[in-house]
Design a protein with these regions (language model features):
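Regulatory and interdomain segments flanking nucleotide-handling catalytic cores
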Residues: 1-648
C-alpha cells in the first residue's frame, strides 16, 4: 500500500517516533545588523531553509511535501467556504500524512524508527550549518510508547525541545586583540574582504547549495552583489553577512522556488513592487518610517480545546495538519489583500527606479523604469507579521490586517464547530505593536520597541477578555511615535501621562489624553463588543475627518497643551477653550462637535471649582489624535467629495 492510500490510523500504528525541527533565536538572526539588504536576505534564507532544504531532505526519506503546489492551488481561493471545503483534499494530495506541518521555521513529522529520525535530524542540522551559518536550529525526536496518544507525545517532545534550547548555544569569543570583527554586524569574525573577494568566498564555500553547487550565473551574481555592498567603504564582513547578501540577491533575481511572502505579493501587484529598497525609501514627512509587528492571540487556549473536540488520534492529527495550513494561508492571504486594496486606491505613492549592475533600467522610450515602494516583509507566516511600511500607512495596514485576519479565523472556527458536537469556545485574533520612528533608528531597536507595544496590546486583550467568557474575543493594537531616541523607555515615558493627568487614579489606566491600546472590533457600532475598549477604527476615522476638513494640527496642539496644564482650574480651562473656539471657523467647530460632542460639555461649574474633574474628560484621546495626525492618509474619495461640495 502506498503512503497516500494509508489512513491516519495506519500512519499512527506504523510510525511511533515524533520529530521536531525548530529554528530558534530567529529575531537575533534576522536583526543582527541594521542593513536592510542583510535583514531581507536573512529572512529569505530562513524561508528557503524551511520550505526548500528541509522538504528536500525529507523527500530522500520518503516524506513528500509539495508546498509550492499547495500554495498555488488553494492560497488564492477568495471564498472562505470553498477554501475550507477543498483544504483537506489538497493537503492530502500534496503533504505526506506523516507530516504534521512545515512552516514558520519549524517542522513536525512522524517516522517509523529512532535511527531514521536521528539520521534526518543530523542531516538537517548539517545543512543549516553549511548554508545558514549562525542560524540556530534544534532537532529532537521522541519515541512514543505503545498506547501513548499523539497529543501527549507532542507535549512531551515540546518539553524535551525546550530543555535542549535552555542549554544554549556555543558562542565564539571575538573580543580578542587579534580578532577582526565584521563591519556590518560587529558580532562575528570578518572573513571576507574586498581585496581577496573571490578567494575568500570560495574558501567559505558560499557557492554551495543543498544539492550541489551554484551555476556560473549564480556565482557571478553572488560575487557582484557582495562586491557592491563592501567596495564603497572597503569593509570586511563575516561569512554570515556574506550569505545574507547572497540570499537577498537570490530573492530578487533567482527566486525559482517562489517561496515566502514576496512571491505572493509581487504576483498580486502584477510585479509592480520594488524589491531592493533602502530604509530611507519608506520615509514620510520628517524622515519617519512605520514598523509593524503582529502576532496571533489565543492559540494556546484554542489548541488546548482541540483535544476536547477531537477525541480520536486520527481526527486530531487530521485537524492539526489542516490548522497549520489555514493559519499560514489566512495570514498571507489577508496581508496580500489589504496591501492590494490600498495599492489599487493609490495609497502607495512613492516609486523608485530599477537598477541593474549599477545602471538605470530603461523602457522603450529611454525613460527609467520605476516600481512602487510597498514594504519590507521581514517575517510573514504562521501567525506572525513583521514588516516595514511608509509611516503614513503602517497603522491603517495593521488595523485592516488584524480585522480581516480575525474575521477569517472566526469563520474557520464557526465552520469547524458546526461539524462537531463539542465546540471550541476560543477564537484566534491578532495583537500588534506599531512603531513610527526616524529612519536612522537601528532595526533591532524598532523590533524591540514593536515587541514591547505588542505585549502591551496583548496584556490589554487578556485584561478585557478574561471576563468575556463564552463571547467572541477581539485583538488589540498599541502604537508609539518615537523621535530621535530609538531606545526610549516607552513604559517610563507613559508614566508621565498618569502622573500629569490622573494623579488620583494612576493605577486604573484612565489617561484622559490617550486610550491606548485600542481594540480592533470596538464598542461603537457592534453590540457584540460593547464591553471592550474603543476601536482603532474610530481613531483613524477621527483623524481622517479632521484632515478632510483641513483642520490644522496646531489647533489640536492648543487643546492638548491646555489639557496638560495643571495650573488652571476646570472653569479656567473651559473659558480658555471657548476663547480658542472663538478663533476657529464654523466648520472647524462643527467637526470638533461631531467628533467629541463639545456643544453640551462646555459648561461652567461652580461646584468643586478647584478640582480639575470635568475638563480632563473632554478630548480624552487628544494625544493619540495629535501623535498620529501626520501618519494617517486622507481618503481621496472623501477629499474629492469635500472639494465638490465647496465648489472647487
Amino acid at each position: 500500500m502506498s503512503e497516500k492510500d494509508k489512513t491516519f490510523e495506519d500512519v499512527l500504528k506504523e510510525n511511533r517516533v515524533l520529530v521536531s525541527i525548530e529554528t530558534v533565536k530567529i529575531k537575533d538572526f534576522i536583526f543582527s545588523t541594521n542593513k536592510l539588504k542583510l535583514i531581507r536576505g536573512a529572512s529569505y534564507l530562513l524561508d528557503y531553509m524551511n520550505q526548500v532544504e528541509v522538504p528536500r531532505i525529507l523527500k530522500k526519506y520518503g516524506l513528500e511535501y509539495k508546498t509550492h503546489e499547495l500554495v498555488n492551488k488553494i492560497y488564492n481561493i477568495n471564498d472562505d467556504k470553498e477554501f475550507l471545503e477543498k483544504v483537506d483534499e489538497e493537503i492530502d494530495k500534496t503533504i505526506d500524512k506523516r507530516i504534521l506541518y512545515i512552516g514558520a521555521g519549524n517542522a513536525k513529522f512522524l517516522v517509523e524508527d529512532k535511527d531514521k529520525a536521528e539520521e534526518i535530524c543530523k542531516e538537517i542540522k548539517e545543512v543549516y550549518k553549511t548554508l545558514a551559518p549562525s542560524a540556530k536550529v534544534v532537532a529532537e525526536c521522541y519515541q512514543m510508547n505503545e498506547n501513548e496518544k499523539i497529543w501527549t507525545a507532542i507535549d512531551e517532545l515540546a518539553q524535551k525541545t525546550a530543555e535542549k534550547k535552555s542549554e544554549g548555544f556555543p558562542m565564539l569569543n571575538i573580543d580578542l586583540p587579534f580578532a577582526v570583527k565584521c563591519d556590518l554586524s560587529g558580532t562575528e569574525p570578518a572573513v571576507v574582504s574586498f581585496k581577496n573577494l573571490e578567494k575568500d568566498l570560495k574558501k567559505i564555500e558560499i557557492h554551495k547549495s543543498g544539492e550541489g553547487s551554484d551555476d556560473d550565473k549564480q556565482v557571478k551574481d553572488t560575487i557582484t552583489a557582495i562586491r557592491n555592498v563592501i567596495k564603497k567603504d572597503n569593509i570586511k564582513i563575516s561569512e554570515e553577512s556574506a550569505v545574507k547578501i547572497k540570499y537577498s540577491n537570490k530573492m530578487i533575481k533567482d527566486d525559482v522556488n517562489e517561496i515566502g511572502f514576496y512571491s505572493i505579493i509581487k504576483k498580486a501587484l502584477s510585479y509592480d513592487i520594488h524589491l531592493n529598497t533602502e530604509i530611507d525609501d519608506y520615509s514620510v514627512g520628517d524622515s519617519f518610517i512605520g514598523f509593524v509587528y503582529s502576532d496571533g492571540d489565543g492559540l494556546g487556549d484554542f489548541l488546548k480545546n482541540v483535544k476536547k473536540v477531537y477525541t480520536t488520534e486520527e481526527e486530531y492529527l487530521k485537524f492539526m495538519r489542516k490548522f497549520s495550513v489555514i493559519l499560514d494561508r489566512n495570514t498571507k492571504y489577508v496581508l496580500k489583500e489589504v496591501i492590494k486594496e490600498m495599492y489599487e486606491k493609490g495609497k502607495f505613492v512613492k516609486k523608485k527606479p530599477i537598477l541593474k549592475d549599477g545602471k538605470f533600467v530603461k523602457d522603450e522610450k529611454g525613460e527609467n523604469i520605476e516600481k512602487s515602494v510597498i514594504g519590507e516583509f521581514l517575517i510573514v507566516g504562521g501567525d506572525d507579521v513583521c514588516a516595514v511600511f511608509p509611516a503614513d500607512l503602517a497603522i491603517e495596514i495593521s488595523y485592516e490586517f488584524q480585522k480581516q485576519f480575525e474575521e477569517k479565523m472566526k469563520k474557520f472556527t464557526e465552520i469547524e464547530n458546526q461539524k462537531n458536537e463539542k465546540k471550541n469556545p476560543e477564537n484566534i485574533t491578532s495583537s500588534c505593536g506599531v512603531v513610527i520612528a526616524k529612519n536612522k533608528t537601528p532595526m533591532f531597536q524598532l523590533f524591540e520597541q514593536g515587541l514591547k507595544l505588542q505585549k502591551s496590546a496583548k496584556a490589554k486583550r487578556y485584561q478585557e477578555n478574561k471576563n468575556r467568557e463564552g463571547k467572541v474575543r477581539t485583538g488589540y493594537i498599541d502604537f508609539q511615535v518615537i523621535g530621535n531616541e530609538g531606545n526610549v523607555n516607552i513604559k517610563e515615558y507613559r508614566k508621565k501621562w498618569y502622573n500629569k493627568f490622573d494623579k488620583e487614579d494612576k493605577n486604573k489606566g484612565k489617561l484622559h489624553v490617550s486610550r491606548r491600546p485600542y481594540s480592533i472590533s470596538g464598542s461603537e457600532k457592534n453590540k457584540e463588543y460593547k464591553d471592550v475598549s474603543e476601536s482603532i477604527k474610530k481613531l483613524i476615522d477621527q483623524v481622517k475627518k479632521l484632515k478632510t476638513k483641513n483642520f490644522p494640527n496646531t489647533k489640536i496642539r492648543y487643546i492638548y497643551d491646555l489639557k496638560k496644564d495643571d495650573t488652571k482650574t476646570d472653569n479656567e480651562k473651559i473659558m480658555e477653550s471657548i476663547n480658542i473656539l472663538s478663533k476657529m471657523s464654523t466648520e472647524e467647530i462643527q467637526v470638533l462637535n461631531e467628533l467629541w460632542g463639545i456643544k453640551d460639555k462646555m459648561n461652567l461649574s461652580f461646584e468643586n471649582e478647584n478640582k480639575n474633574e470635568k475638563f480632563k474628560e473632554f478630548f480624552d484621546n487628544i494625544f493619540d489624535v495629535l501623535e498620529i495626525y501626520d501618519f494617517i492618509q486622507k481618503d481621496k474619495s472623501s477629499s474629492e467629495k469635500e472639494d465638490n461640495n465647496s465648489g472647487n
